[in-house]
Amino acid sequence: IDYITFSTEGNAADFGNLLATRETLDGSSNSIRGIFTGGNPGSIDNVMQYITIASTGNATDFGNLTVARQNLGSASSPTRQVNMGGVTPSASNVIDFTEIMTTGNAVDFGDLTAARSNGMPVSSSTRAVYAGGDPGPSNVDFITIASQGNGIDYGDLSVARYAGGGADNSVKGVFAGSYPNSNTIDSLIIATGGTATDFGDMTAAREKAKGVSNSHGGLNDGYQGTRPLPIGGTG
């Protein structure tokens, strides 16, 4: 596990270690805890693990997903974390959730509008959004994080794609890159949805990226490197 400080540029520093070596997991957080979910340490598993963001150290076991999967999308409100879609090894429509400041197994939340993996999640304090995904739809689902239920289709990406990175400032969500290598960045307002609009281009086409943000800017980390972008505008 590495970390960076948003207000300064520079290389990532060592934070600690996951419970085991793994790939194709996802993660989300509130201001205190980060939770990493699923993945593949040799076979697809259901492990959830957490860290306390303010202090470096190794991850601790949190509990288990309702269904073992990888390539899922995680998002959160200040109190609840949701995990959407993934591969089981077939594409999954499962949504499950946890309460971030407790530990324990995930609980069923509902279903996406279609089974898919490698979508791009973003969230506000009330809504989680899952955009795109494999096998290649452009549709964008949302859920209301505080109440269980199925995903609702409320818009489309400007270009159908998957395996990009999502980041947000709790008002606007941005979606950057995709498989196969793309430099597309588009955005939408989380509260209203609709068709995503062009935001700008990445410095290089990249895929399998992950995005993070504070309230001012975001970082998109993919196969071709890391680039900051100001979420509130375009660029």
Predicted regions and their residues:
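Polar, enzyme-active/binding microenvironments
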Residues: I1-G235
